[in-house]
Structures are given as C-alpha cells and as structure tokens.
Amino acid sequence: MIANWVNQFGKSKTNKLIDYLNQSHGTDLRINLPIDKVESRLLDQGISWSNSPNSKNFIRINSGLRKILSSQIHLSGKVFVQNRAAGAVVEILNPKPSETILDVCAAPGTKSIYIFQKMNQSGNLFASDINSSQVAKSFKRCNDLELSIDWKVKDATKDIFPMADRILIDAPCTGTGVISRNPDIKWRKDSKDTDKMSAYQIKILLLPEAQVA
C-alpha cells in the first residue's frame, strides 16, 4: 500500500499522509440548529468540542461522544454523528428542493438524511442499498425522524433505477481512506483487495449513469 502511494503521490506527500493517518482526529458532529442553541446543551453535559474550520454545519467532538449518542438532542435528529468529509460530498452534490435524487449504496443513511434536509424535505429522494437489513434500519431511522425518504433494496450493478436530476454513489471501497479511524485496515487489505474492489466499483458507477435526466 505504501509503495502504491509513493508511486502515485511521491515520498513527501506520502509521508505527510502517513503522519495524518497515524493521528486521532476526534469525531465530527453535524448540527441542524444554530450553534448558539447547541452550545449550551453541550456545555451542560460536559462535552468538549471545537468549531469546524470550513463549515458552520459541523463541529468536532473532542470528548464526551458517548453522552452525545444517548442525549435527546441526538435521538431527536438535532445533531448527527457524521464525518466532515462525508458531509462535504453532499455539499458538492448540491441538492435542490423539488428535485429527484438517487442515493445509491446509501446505508446507513446519514448522507441521505443530509441530502433530504438540503432539499428542504421537498422533492423525491430514492435511497438504495444491496443489504436488506441495513435498508430496514435506515428506513426506520428516517421514519422515526419523519423524513419521507424512499428506501429500496437494490443491486447497483444490475437493477433499474428511476430517472433523476442528480445521483450520489458511495460505492463500496477498501476503507484505506479512513485508516486513522480503523488502523487495522493496514494489515487486512492488500493489492488484490484493491483490484477486486475497483472492478466492482466500475460496475456500480456505469449502471446508474444512464439514469440522470
């Protein structure tokens, strides 16, 4: 893996990447309320956090994550545990109200929820995943939050999807981009895994592209 990085990025950038991935970066939290309304609730629970440098919709939790997960503010959908990079993907998609959007390979649905909220809950969001149990959990979560996202079990390599204005495909991957959160990936993945996953990703990416209106 390191050899591939050196070939692709050069030694200097690879060393910087390794240094970054060997560090702990805390947990990101997406907020659906003005920060001043969230701040007091976090402080009351003794939770340490800091602002995200490039988004008013995210903060970084430094300590107290377990308190967040069991808090009413989290259970009611006022805040979501969501990686800042995953949120940036939704912002690049730039969903608009009244559009029809596909979210493919969407479970567990955190990005789907962000997309629908960006749409002001107006329009059609079709979310799908091949894992039926994950789809059931995602549907229940959205239903509990009163979000009318249309969840379906679909195989993105062969099933038919509705026409859409925009498509987000979070294709399955080797996970090497999140080594800082899952360091054991360094020892569990090799070049064969990468080649196999790349071929699978291409099959997924080619099928829904014809569904963009």
Give the location of each predicted region.
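S-adenosylmethionine
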Residues: 1-213
